[in-house]
Amino acid sequence: MNEFQPVNRRQFLFTLGATAASAILLKGCGNPPSSSGGGTSSTTQPTAAGASDLEVKTIKLGYIPIFEAAPLIIGREKGFFAKYGLDVEVSKQASWAAARDNVILGSAGGGIDGGQWQMPMPALLTEGAISNGQKVPMYVLACLSTQGNGIAVSNQLKAQNLGLKLAPNRDFILNYPQTSGRKFKASYTFPNANQDFWIRYWFAAGGIDPDKDIELLTVPSAETLQNMRNGTIDCFSTGDPWPSRIAKDDIGYQAALTGQMWPYHPEEFLALRADWVDKHPKATLALLMGLMEAQQWCDQKANRAEMAKILSGRNFFNVPVSILQPILEGQIKVGADGKDLNNFDAGPLFWKSPRGSVSYPYKGLTLWFLVESIRWGFNKQVLPDIAAAQKLNDRVTREDLWQEAAKKLGVPAADIPTGSTRGTETFFDGITYNPDSPQAYLQSLKIKRA
């Protein structure tokens, strides 16, 4: 797939009536934004035509302080959402469980209208599978990023030099109860979703059954640092900056990046309560247009230093720029020897990748998370088989709204995907996933519960 084109100036002006099109793909302008999560945006964008015609002017989005949240924070702080008439409140969530509970409430009940989600949380909320049977229909509107996740291992295991391929360490991990008095302990931030899937795939590819051979725990991202320091966990899967901070603080090392496991994989997604979207179609498109501009801004190398400064703010990540900026610039240390990849594309990407669109919510990619749920026997009551997964995925993932927003924004037609897949996806262990044949993928896996 060809690299994306910058939004055409004439198309943009014609479509939106804005006074300047340069905000889409230019370097950051103005003074660096404050770290405040409230108040007015520090950068003012030209107001787009139609911005005053929205059904609602406010929305509350939840986020977890990892890089997947960057487009939401940048969209607010750089004024991209305000440009389209929306006052977006970005609300830091203490955990994924808190985000789940708050979206059940909705903003009218003191919660949130949606935000950043691990997959397939929106689909599971839709069916009430993770909300005590209470169905909260959700729509998946866009992918927020690719990559930006890693698996960190304690320095106590530095001599073993765990890496992308675990087969050489299989016996060590299987014999851990005999050598250490307990099973090898690994953690993720929320069960049955992204980071659980990444670490399960990593172990299973190395011939280690994550349900039988090790102990898996749920630990919020911000608590992983202390848990690894005190020896509660041996490794964990979560989003940066936490794996890189483990290495920076010399508590552990990054054994593998999820981008090595599945190059340019889908990461977390923007999803909203379906009732909010259905009630506010114009505001939904405005939100998506602001998000798309924010994602394009985030993808520019020249903006990464300012981006790190914004995200480092106390009300956002509260992590030093010295930790954030190298990751955003692809200077990521991997392995027990701390080798620096020094590859911009190895870090988080937000708008495009060598595989094409990052932002587009390909149904074939959102389906993978449901298929992986079936692999591990998760939520059988709503995911009994592939057909049920496909039906649920088609209901929740809204490619059509992304396409409509992109056209309204003036994104060139060649840069708006028309299909629901990127073709065959290939994992580091040689396994392939063809979204048109998910059953074949499932059958090809050796360790599974299905």
Swiss-Prot record:
Question: Which InterPro entries does the annotation name?
Answer: NrtA/CpmA_ABC-bd_dom, TAT_signal
Family, according to the entry, reads as follows:
Belongs to the CmpA/NrtA family.
Q: Which residues form the signal peptide?
A: 1-36
Induction cue: By carbon dioxide-limited conditions, probably via CmpR. Also induced by growth under high light intensities. Repressed by iron-deficient conditions.
Q: Which GO terms describe its biological process?
A: monoatomic ion transport
Report the protein's function: Part of the ABC transporter complex CmpABCD involved in bicarbonate transport. Binds bicarbonate with high affinity.
Q: How does it assemble?
A: The complex is composed of two ATP-binding proteins (CmpC and CmpD), a transmembrane protein (CmpB) and a solute-binding protein (CmpA).
A Pfam family name for this chain?
NMT1_2
Domain of life, per UniProt, equals: Bacteria
Subcellular locations according to the entry: Cell inner membrane
Gene Ontology terms, MF aspect:
bicarbonate transmembrane transporter activity
Keywords of the record, alphabetical order, are: Cell inner membrane, Cell membrane, Ion transport, Membrane, Signal, Transport
Recorded protein name is Bicarbonate-binding protein CmpA
This entry carries the following GO cellular component terms, namely: plasma membrane
The record, for PROSITE patterns, names: TAT
